[in-house]
Amino acid sequence: METYVNKLHEGSTYTAAVQYNVLEKDDDPASLTIWVPMFQSSMPADLLIKELANVNILVKQISTPKGPSLRVMINSRSAVLAQMPSKFTICANVSLDERSKLAYDVTTPCEIKACSLTCLKSKNMLTTVKDLTMKTLNPTHDIIALCEFENIVTSKKVIIPTYLRSISVRNKDLNTLENITTTEFKNAITNAKIIPYSGLLLVITVTDNKGAFKYIKPQSQFIVDLGAYLEKESIYYVTTNWKHTATRFAIKPMED
């Protein structure tokens, strides 16, 4: 089994983002990706990852109003994992690598192939796209971060366009806003990292909360779901070989 710890926060209390790669224990096994709902922990990461690697995982494919889903049950006797959710449901469309091999409504034990723990800042220092979108009245433009990553093994570069938020801009203010994005946004973002969770997440650390980031606390982490980007890469490959090299910004009129 492979285990990985990504420390994006060094505080005594942190948000744990846990993802497993598992294989069903049956005659026609499906390969699955399972992510645990984020939880708060104060356990040293090295201790927590050891306990995470020694749990028993059961899965069952079910049907929900949101589509095919996986019901996950994680069993552990360790007090270290007391804060971790033990029963939850995740989207099967994202988590299944081999969906045709997964039986319906059958509870199946799984073998853990890899486990990743990412230590993020505490819950009150995390912001999502949804958090910002809800705060915008009469939006006219979208702010897009063009995050560039490089595979340090192959030197291949990937640019991931990431929606940050919508803003309301009058035409006479647009030129001024475009002029300040280069400096203001560049100063606001110090780094961006890809982490394995619900497929892949982009974690952006915001150091300055001016302008477009005024609703984000300084020094907080902004989380963006990357969906299918790089989903075929292994946990090990993404966490060790993909490095953030640059971030550019674009302001685009909202499309109907």
UniProtKB/Swiss-Prot annotation:
The modification Phosphothreonine is found at residue 205. Signal peptide: none annotated. InterPro entries: Matrix_Pneumo_C, MATRX_N_pneumovirus, Pneu_matrix_N. Its main location: virion. GO terms for molecular function: structural constituent of virion. Keywords: Host cell membrane, Host cytoplasm, Host membrane, Host nucleus, Host-virus interaction, Membrane, Phosphoprotein, Viral matrix protein, Virion. Residues 110-183 are annotated as: Nuclear targeting and binding to host importin KPNB1. It is found in: Virion; Host cytoplasm; Host nucleus; Host cell membrane. Coiled coil: none annotated. Changing residue 172 to A: About 80% loss of host transcriptional inhibition activity. Pfam families: Matrix_Pneumo_C, Matrix_Pneumo_N. It is a peripheral membrane protein. Phosphorylation is important for oligomerization. GO terms for cellular component: host cell cytoplasm; host cell nucleus; host cell plasma membrane; membrane; viral envelope; viral tegument. GO terms for biological process: virion assembly. It comes from the Viruses. Residues 1-110 are annotated as: Interaction with M2-1. Changing residue 170 to A: About 80% loss of host transcriptional inhibition activity. Belongs to the pneumovirinae M protein family. Forms dimers. Forms higher-order oligomers. Interacts with glycoprotein G (via N-terminus). Interacts with protein M2-1; this interaction directs the matrix protein localization to cytoplasmic inclusions comprising viral proteins L, N, P, and M2-1 and mediates the matrix protein association with the nucleocapsid. Interacts with host importin KPNB1; this interaction mediates nuclear import of the matrix protein early during infection. Interacts with host AP3M1; this interaction plays an essential role in trafficking the matrix protein in host cells. Plays a crucial role in virus assembly into filaments and budding. Early in infection, localizes in the nucleus where it inhibits host cell transcription through direct binding to host chromatin. Later in infection, traffics to the cytoplasm through the action of host CRM1 to associate with inclusion bodies, the site of viral transcription and replication. During virus assembly and budding, acts as a bridge between the nucleocapsid and the lipid bilayer. Also plays a role in the inhibition of host interferon-beta response in a RACK1-dependent manner. This is Matrix protein. The lineage of its organism: Viruses, Riboviria, Orthornavirae, Negarnaviricota, Haploviricotina.
